[in-house]
């Protein structure tokens, strides 16, 4: 059965009120959507007064619709001189509009036109999962959860201050008003959290009371006599309370490593008002595995929509949105949205690719299958097979991403180049990063390890079994290619990959070898020869010319990447391996948590997907460190947990004494 979303179809009756034929209901009151948003949702939750004087404020909504409640709340936040420092808005939507549909239903909202335009500009490709949108330089976030609320709300990790319940009426859309939904809202509610909804249906009020809310009626909007408001009492406790952020004596972090991982973490924390000390052994950013001139990025796809597929989809789409935002802000990333063609290996593989596309049911602007003729037309050069076309994918020089991130972070980041940290020492409520002589280079409550394999000597990471993987890319002279045969204008991958030719560049780039356990930094003739064979397979029209190339005369790039035992990155708080391995340690209870090393976090093992994980990992860490909704489903965040290998072993009794 297709896993893709069924999109909303915009309909505007003569009175201009957006209407859903699927639910036979309007998206907001016929007496004015903006006025309803102010009366029911802002007024019903005591806003803007409720957020005043707070560092952050989190609102969770059921039923995003056209986004009018979000836009009204964002506008009210902007207009409030006493506003909170950061507004986090989470909304669940089963049937989202696409960008064109939003434009149609937004046409009536002139008062919010500029904010609506910003929302549409950031609007994600409508595929299932969690999508983080960032506005106002990081001070406003919108976390869209696209899919069924009963499935997604249990995966939401946050601490909510207010709730907007705005699905279609309980009579028309009963699934969104079930006891299970209300229990999930109670799970993430802070003590004192407020709730408002336009409906006064008895079943809704009863369900909210059963979940622990204190419920009452209030004057409704327009022709509705009553609406419902509620509060979550401070004395009520659910079995698992909301996910609260740690409390730090100061908002200062040391980040070790200035590659894609470290620079992205620095930028995301800086956007939240943190001060960063960024330390690296090289003399400039991207001095390690992030140093290569160009790299491609595209998602992983599988018939079962695996954890890797879901994570890589989230990472690719978030990175693309974020880099576009940096570009608009004047921090040039150099990302080339050329698209990526992933070739089928043979006819049977082509049939399987088509089956997967049909089964997933995702939009064509995320993934499409093209036969060889259409694929050749799309990339501007002949290809031996058809394949998957990823329209949102492309390529970029990782050092450019690093420089853009640091430029965006600005003075919040103190740069310490050519500096090697020999030890990390706990001191009082923080960490000291020391050199070989014991001198304290920096001290802060938080340390983020983004220094690849070097992290192993500084932190308890034995359970992750981090290993090196050597990769070699080859620069092929343009003069060595078949004369008059076009070169692809998009990334083409299969057995290896090739990148489009940069304007005026004398070479084109092809890769890559994959050699687990190897760290040799010197280029090898045999690997250049293997890359030439890969290129001949991707571009058979150049095969004869490539056969005449002497691989011993070629140049290229060698990088050593870091991978974990299951090839997924390590992103999150570092587990306290010493405490866990102590005799008698047990996990107790179904929701038992691993002990963590206070203030120590990892952004490691990005492997060959550094571009994919960089922004997602940084946004996830920033939320874990500083608070706010996670940008991923909880189960996906757990799949990246640095302590996941220990957790798995403990559950299987392997470390029980």
Curated annotation (Swiss-Prot):
Q: Which UniProt keywords apply?
A: Cytoplasm, FAD, Flavoprotein, Methyltransferase, Multifunctional enzyme, Oxidoreductase, S-adenosyl-L-methionine, Transferase, tRNA processing
Report the protein's function.
Catalyzes the last two steps in the biosynthesis of 5-methylaminomethyl-2-thiouridine (mnm(5)s(2)U) at the wobble position (U34) in tRNA. Catalyzes the FAD-dependent demodification of cmnm(5)s(2)U34 to nm(5)s(2)U34, followed by the transfer of a methyl group from S-adenosyl-L-methionine to nm(5)s(2)U34, to form mnm(5)s(2)U34.
Entries under InterPro entries matching the protein: FAD-dep_OxRdtase (IPR006076), FAD/NAD-bd_sf (IPR036188), MnmC-like_methylTransf (IPR008471), SAM-dependent_MTases_sf (IPR029063), tRNA_MAMT_biosynth_bifunc_MnmC (IPR023032), tRNA_MNMC2 (IPR047785), tRNA_S-uridine_synth_MnmC_C (IPR017610)
Q: What is this protein called?
A: tRNA 5-methylaminomethyl-2-thiouridine biosynthesis bifunctional protein MnmC
BP terms from Gene Ontology: methylation; tRNA wobble base modification
The superkingdom listed in its UniProt entry is Bacteria
The UniProt catalytic activity note for this protein reads: 5-aminomethyl-2-thiouridine(34) in tRNA + S-adenosyl-L-methionine = 5-methylaminomethyl-2-thiouridine(34) in tRNA + S-adenosyl-L-homocysteine + H(+)
Region feature tRNA (mnm(5)s(2)U34)-methyltransferase, mapped onto this chain: 1-233
Q: Which GO terms describe its molecular function?
A: flavin adenine dinucleotide binding; oxidoreductase activity, acting on the CH-NH group of donors; tRNA (5-methylaminomethyl-2-thiouridylate)(34)-methyltransferase activity
Chain spans, region FAD-dependent cmnm(5)s(2)U34 oxidoreductase? 256-657
Any GO CC annotation of this UniProt entry: cytoplasm
**Family according to the record:** In the N-terminal section; belongs to the methyltransferase superfamily. tRNA (mnm(5)s(2)U34)-methyltransferase family.
The EC number(s) given in the record are 2.1.1.61, 1.5.-.-
| Localization | Cytoplasm
Q: Which cofactor does it need?
A: FAD
């Amino acid at each position: 059965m297709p896993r893709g979303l069924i999109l909303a179809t915009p309909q505007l009756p003569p009175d201009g009120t957006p209407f859903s034929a699927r639910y036979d209901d309007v998206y907001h009151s016929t007496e004015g959507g903006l006025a309803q948003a102010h009366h029911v949702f802002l007024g019903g939750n005591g806003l803007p007064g409720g957020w005043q004087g707070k560092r952050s404020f989190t609102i969770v909504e059921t039923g995003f619709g056209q986004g009018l409640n979000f836009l009204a709340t964002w506008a009210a936040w902007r207009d409030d001189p006493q506003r909170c420092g950061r507004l986090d808005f989470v909304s669940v939507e089963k049937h989202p509009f696409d960008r064109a549909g939003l434009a149609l239903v937004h046409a009536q909202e002139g008062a919010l036109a500029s904010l609506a335009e910003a929302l549409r500009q950031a609007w994600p490709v409508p595929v299932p999962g969690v999508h983080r949108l960032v506005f106002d330089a990081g001070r406003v976030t919108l976390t869209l959860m696209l899919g069924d609320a009963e499935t997604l709300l249990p995966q939401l990790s946050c601490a909510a201050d207010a709730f907007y319940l705005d699905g279609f009426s309980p009579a028309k859309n009963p699934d969104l008003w079930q006891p299970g939904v209300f229990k999930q809202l109670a799970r993430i509610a802070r003590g004192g959290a407020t709730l408002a909804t336009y409906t006064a249906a008895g079943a809704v009020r009863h369900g909210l009371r059963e979940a622990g809310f204190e419920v009452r009626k209030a004057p409704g909007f327009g022709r509705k006599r009553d609406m419902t408001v509620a509060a979550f009492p401070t004395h009520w406790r659910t079995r698992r309370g909301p996910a609260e952020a740690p409390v730090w004596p100061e908002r200062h972090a040391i980040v070790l490593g200035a590659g894609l991982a470290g620079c992205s973490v620095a930028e995301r924390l800086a956007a939240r008002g943190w001060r960063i000390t960024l330390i690296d052994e090289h003399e400039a950013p991207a001095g390690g595995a992030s140093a290569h001139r160009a790299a491609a990025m595209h998602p992983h796809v599988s018939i079962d929509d695996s954890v890797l597929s879901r994570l890589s989809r989230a990472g690719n789409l978030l990175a693309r949105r974020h880099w576009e935002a940096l570009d608009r802000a004047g921090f040039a990333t150099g990302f080339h949205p050329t698209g990526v063609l992933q070739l089928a290996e043979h006819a049977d593989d082509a049939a399987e690719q088509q089956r997967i596309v049909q089964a997933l049911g995702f939009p064509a602007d995320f993934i499409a299958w093209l036969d060889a003729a259409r694929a050749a037309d799309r990339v501007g050069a002949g290809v031996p097979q058809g394949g998957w076309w990823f329209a949102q994918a492309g390529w970029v020089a990782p050092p450019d991403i690093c420089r853009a991130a640091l430029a965006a972070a600005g003075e919040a980041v103190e740069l310490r180049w050519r500096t090697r940290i020999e030890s990390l020492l706990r001191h009082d409520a923080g960490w000291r990063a020391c050199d070989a002589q014991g001198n304290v280079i920096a001290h802060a409550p938080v340390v983020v390890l983004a220094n690849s394999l070097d992290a192993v000597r500084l932190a308890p990471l034995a359970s992750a079994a981090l290993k090196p993987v050597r990769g070699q890319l080859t620069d092929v002279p343009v003069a060595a290619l078949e004369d008059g045969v076009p070169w692809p204008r998009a990334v083409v991958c299969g057995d290896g990959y090739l990148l489009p030719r940069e304007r005026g560049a004398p070479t084109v780039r092809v890769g890559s070898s994959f050699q687990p356990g190897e760290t040799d930094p010197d280029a090898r003739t045999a690997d250049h020869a293997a890359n030439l064979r890969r290129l001949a397979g991707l571009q058979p029209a150049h095969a004869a010319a490539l056969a005449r190339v002497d691989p011993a005369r070629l140049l290229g790039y060698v990088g050593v990447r870091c991978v974990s035992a299951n090839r997924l990155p390590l992103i999150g708080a570092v587990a306290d391996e010493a405490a866990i391995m102590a005799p008698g340690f047990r996990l107790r209870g179904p929701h038992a948590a691993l002990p963590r090393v206070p203030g120590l976090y990892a952004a490691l093992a990005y492997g060959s997907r550094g571009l994919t994980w960089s922004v997602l990992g940084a946004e996830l860490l920033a939320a874990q460190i500083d608070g706010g909704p996670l940008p991923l489903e909880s189960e996906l965040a757990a799949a990246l947990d640095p302590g996941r290998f220990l957790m798995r072993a403990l559950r299987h009794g392997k470390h029980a004494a």
